[in-house]
């Protein structure tokens, strides 16, 4: 045993230069297994640095080794542990999977430049007054006309009330004759009271008609903006989406569109009309009652507005905190529910609930601050308005005593101010919500201003390609996701039209990156990629992506029926074509066994289907797309061996006359490839056919092949050993049974 350990450690020391991070893990596992129990760390030691823990590990290994094997036999182990100390415990990644090395932004506009509020309003008004929609502009003009009529009727109402009070106050028989219906109607007081009612009804009528006419303008604007944002997000490059949480983006779009609706209503029907009505009331009071009334009114309104604006600005930060907490809570809930099975596997329901409750508590705290400060705002507004109204009433009373004003004038002044109080009470809410809506719209319009790094050249021609000309060529391609960490370092190869080429290599060697570059999710920093002899950067993205089909490693399906997900490969395909590709992918019979057949809902992200079924759906819809070039990114990774062989046979027929590139981990799936390209450290290390590469026993491919083959053989051997053990136990049981039977027979006494 000691000799075996010594040879193992000599081999490990000789392999220091080859993938250090892998061998460090191997050495650590070997040390722990040989030394009995591994090192135990206290809770404080777990938080220590990697180097500190490694030092503790090696010291523990020295002590344990000396105790168990003695100093002479542990020399090689000590040499190996010294080598371990010189290796970094955690190395920087040079590969890239998703957003490795960086967290997702929960704020959708994090790292983006804000858009000026004036530009937001200008952009929004361009949707309200579109040059290509004269019908919508006509609706806006009609709405403004009804708005003016409603405000005019509002001003008339207090005047009608004044004349009615003055008429009744004179108590003249000619002015008020209630002896019969005609005389009652004919009296001035009654006519004025009827006019009062008509004015109020007219104001309400104009307001409601205005809302009905303008409704189409507002909803059309919201729809167009939301559609443009949605389309723009789809046009952004993959790097943007990998750095943003989908839940946060969804909430940003939702809040932004709701904000547009509110701002449109607030600007057109609240803020501007309030200003207009304030000026109109002040002018009427100046003309009818004098400058003092106008000054008190303007002073009250000015103080009211200034107080509202100041307090609302201060309160806005609480709303921002609420939004952030709402975003975090929403993201946590979505993330947890999407990982429902993982939560169950680790019994972490309470942990997830506590985590979610933490975000809700933050939201609750900010919400309480917002509610309490709102009470302060409302009280301050009422106090200012009450002081102004009292001052106006005192002035009116003095005017009545002096004979300059009538009782009707006092009622008119009171009515005018109270009419202003309604929109003024709403002013605080309108201003607060408008500011919040502008914040939400800022996020929305900031997203619209984001420029994609992957775009067409001006007047880029479509890709000219046929299955006979679909050659793929990489020419000295250099690429890195993070500056200074090269993923591809001068990769060059060519895939002839109609040929099947496999790309293999270790994890992080750049296999999947080739798929992303060929689909133009990213651009290489150096070098060129050609398809059908045309540089990818010179042709339109739409034509390029129509010509390339991709079967991803992780197939994600839409929350819809199986038929919908299959049809997504070509939305114009007939049902017969959909059924044909399902049969080709070995999926048709499995679908027919489902309760609803092709109308079966697959669940969110396809969670109701098994991994193999999802993979077959992805393969089927890629076949339905019928592109000249197909990329398989470990497309059979989720399949069992029997299904894998069935699908591989089907795929051989599919790719027979088209260019195909297989990104493979299991080498057995690409044995029949016309050429196999082996990537190592971002470069093409080897290339050739399966048997040609195996002929070189020292090649990377040969080593990978034998490693995988030995693993399969070991699994088979373990299965055979278990079977033999089971058989030997059965034979032993039978032998024991025979001995018991024979002993009974030899005794001759049945009582035995």
Curated annotation (Swiss-Prot):
N6-acetyllysine modifications at: 216, 251, 350
Name of the protein this chain belongs to: Iron-sulfur clusters transporter ABCB7, mitochondrial
Knockout consequences: Heterozygous females for Abcb7 with a maternally inherited mutant allele die embryonically, due to a defect in the extra-embryonic visceral endoderm, while heterozygous females with a paternally inherited mutant allele are viable. The systemic and tissue-specific deletion of ABCB7 in most organs, including CNS and bone marrow, is lethal. Conditional knockout in hepatocyte causes periportal hepatocellular iron deposition with characteristic round structures and leads to iron-dependent regulation of IRP1 protein.
Extent of the transit peptide: 1-22
GO BP term, pick one: iron-sulfur cluster assembly
First-listed, main subcellular location of the protein, grouped into a coarse class: mitochondrion
Membrane topology: Multi-pass membrane protein
Modified residues (Phosphotyrosine): 340
Lineage: Eukaryota, Metazoa, Chordata, Craniata, Vertebrata
Phosphothreonine, modified sites: 342
GO CC term, one of those recorded: mitochondrion
Biased composition (Polar residues): 56-68
Positions bearing Phosphoserine: 336
Mitochondrial matrix topology ranges: 23-140, 207-259, 312-382, 431-752
Species assigned in the record: Mus musculus
Protein family (similarity comment): Belongs to the ABC transporter superfamily. ABCB family. Heavy Metal importer (TC 3.A.1.210) subfamily.
Low complexity composition-biased segments: 42-55
Alphabetically ordered keywords of this record: Acetylation, ATP-binding, Membrane, Mitochondrion, Mitochondrion inner membrane, Nucleotide-binding, Phosphoprotein, Transit peptide, Transmembrane, Transmembrane helix, Transport
Known partners and oligomeric status: Homodimer or heterodimer. Interacts with C10orf88/PAAT. Forms a complex with ABCB10 and FECH, where a dimeric FECH bridges ABCB7 and ABCB10 homodimers; this complex may be required for cellular iron homeostasis, mitochondrial function and heme biosynthesis. Interacts with FECH. Interacts with ATP5F1A. Interacts with COX4I1; this interaction allows the regulation of cellular iron homeostasis and cellular reactive oxygen species (ROS) levels in cardiomyocytes.
Residue ranges of every copy of the ABC transmembrane type-1 domain listed in the record: 140-436
Residues the entry annotates as binding glutathione: 315-319, 378-381, 428
Domain spans labelled ABC transporter: 472-706
Described purpose of this protein according to its UniProt entry: Exports glutathione-coordinated iron-sulfur clusters such as [2Fe-2S]-(GS)4 cluster from the mitochondria to the cytosol in an ATP-dependent manner allowing the assembly of the cytosolic iron-sulfur (Fe/S) cluster-containing proteins and participates in iron homeostasis. Moreover, through a functional complex formed of ABCB7, FECH and ABCB10, also plays a role in the cellular iron homeostasis, mitochondrial function and heme biosynthesis. In cardiomyocytes, regulates cellular iron homeostasis and cellular reactive oxygen species (ROS) levels through its interaction with COX4I1.
């Amino acid at each position: 045993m000691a000799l075996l350990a010594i040879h193992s450690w000599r081999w490990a020391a000789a392999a220091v230069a080859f993938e250090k991070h892998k061998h460090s893990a191997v050495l650590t596992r070997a040390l722990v297994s040989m030394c009995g129990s591994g090192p135990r760390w206290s809770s404080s030691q777990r938080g220590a640095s990697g180097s500190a823990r490694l030092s503790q590990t090696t010291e523990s290994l020295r002590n344990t080794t000396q105790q168990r094997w003695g100093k002479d036999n542990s020399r090689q182990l000590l040499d190996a542990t010294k080598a371990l100390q010189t290796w970094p415990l955690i190395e920087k990644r040079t590969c890239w999977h998703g957003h490795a090395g960086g967290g997702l932004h929960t704020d959708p506009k994090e790292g983006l430049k804000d858009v000026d509020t004036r530009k937001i309003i200008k952009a929004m008004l361009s949707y309200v007054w579109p040059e290509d929609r004269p019908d919508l502009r006509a609706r806006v003009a009609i709405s403004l006309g009804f708005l003016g009529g409603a405000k005019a009727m509002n001003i008339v109402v207090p005047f009608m009330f004044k004349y009615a009070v003055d008429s009744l106050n004179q108590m003249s028989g000619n002015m008020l004759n209630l002896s019969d219906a005609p005389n009652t109607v004919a009296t001035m007081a009654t006519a004025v009271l009827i006019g009062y009612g008509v004015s109020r009804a007219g104001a309400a009528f104009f307001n409601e008609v205005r809302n009905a006419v303008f409704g189409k303008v507002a909803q059309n604007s919201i729809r167009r903006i939301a559609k443009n944002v949605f389309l723009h997000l789809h046009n952004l490059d993959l790097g943007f989406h990998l750095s943003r949480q989908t839940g946060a983006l969804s909430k940003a779009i939702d809040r932004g569109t709701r904000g547009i609706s509110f701002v449109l209503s607030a600007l057109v029907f609240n803020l501007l009309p309030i200003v207009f009505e304030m000026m109109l009331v002040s002018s009427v009071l100046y003309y009818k009652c004098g400058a003092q009334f106008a000054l008190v009114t303007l002073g009250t309104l000015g103080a009211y507005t200034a107080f509202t604006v100041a307090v609302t600005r201060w309160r806005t930060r609480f709303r921002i905190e609420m939004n952030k907490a709402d975003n975090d809570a929403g993201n946590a809930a979505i993330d947890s529910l999407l990982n429902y099975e993982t939560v169950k596997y680790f019994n972490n329901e309470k942990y997830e609930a506590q985590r979610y409750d933490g975000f809700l508590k933050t939201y609750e705290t900010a919400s309480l601050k917002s509610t309490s400060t709102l009470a302060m705002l409302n009280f301050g507004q009422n106090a200012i308005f009450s002081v102004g109204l009292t001052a106006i009433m005192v002035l009116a009373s003095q005017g009545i005593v002096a004979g300059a004003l009538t009782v009707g004038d006092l009622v008119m002044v009171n009515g005018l101010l109270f009419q202003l109080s309604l929109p003024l009470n709403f002013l605080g809410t309108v201003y607060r919500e408008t500011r919040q809506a502008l914040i939400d719209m800022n996020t929305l319009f900031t997203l619209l201003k984001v420029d994609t790094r992957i775009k067409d050249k001006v007047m880029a021609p479509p890709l000219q390609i046929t299955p006979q000309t679909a050659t793929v060529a990489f020419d000295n391609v250099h690429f890195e996701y993070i500056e200074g960490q090269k993923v591809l370092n001068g990769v060059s190869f060519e895939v002839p039209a109609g040929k099947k080429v496999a790309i293999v290599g270790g994890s992080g060697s750049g296999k999947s990156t080739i798929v992303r570059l060929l689909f133009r999710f990213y651009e290489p920093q150096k070098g060129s990629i050609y398809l059908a002899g045309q540089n990818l950067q010179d042709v339109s993205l739409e034509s390029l992506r129509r010509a390339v089909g991709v079967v991803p490693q992780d197939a994600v399906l839409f929350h819809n029926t199986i038929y919908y997900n299959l049809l997504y490969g070509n939305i114009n395909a007939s049902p017969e074509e959909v059924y044909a590709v399902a049969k080709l992918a070995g999926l048709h019979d499995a679908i027919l066994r489902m309760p609803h057949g092709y109308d079966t809902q697959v669940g969110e992200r396809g969670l109701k289907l098994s991994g193999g079924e999802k993979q077959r759906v992805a393969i089927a819809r890629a076949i339905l797309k019928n592109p000249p070039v197909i990329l398989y990114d470990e497309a059979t990774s989720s399949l069992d061996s029997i299904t894998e062989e069935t699908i591989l046979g089907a795929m051989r027929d599919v790719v027979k006359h088209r260019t195909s590139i297989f990104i493979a981990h299991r080498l057995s799936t690409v044995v029949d490839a016309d050429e196999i390209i082996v990537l190592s450290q971002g470069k093409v290390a080897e290339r050739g056919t399966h048997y040609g590469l195996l002929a070189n026993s020292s090649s990377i491919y040969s080593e990978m092949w034998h490693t995988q083959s030995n693993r399969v053989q070991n699994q088979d051997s373990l299965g055979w050993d278990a079977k033999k053990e089971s058989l030997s136990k059965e034979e032993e049981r039978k032998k024991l049974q025979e001995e018991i039977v024979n002993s009974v027979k030899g005794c001759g006494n049945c009582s035995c």
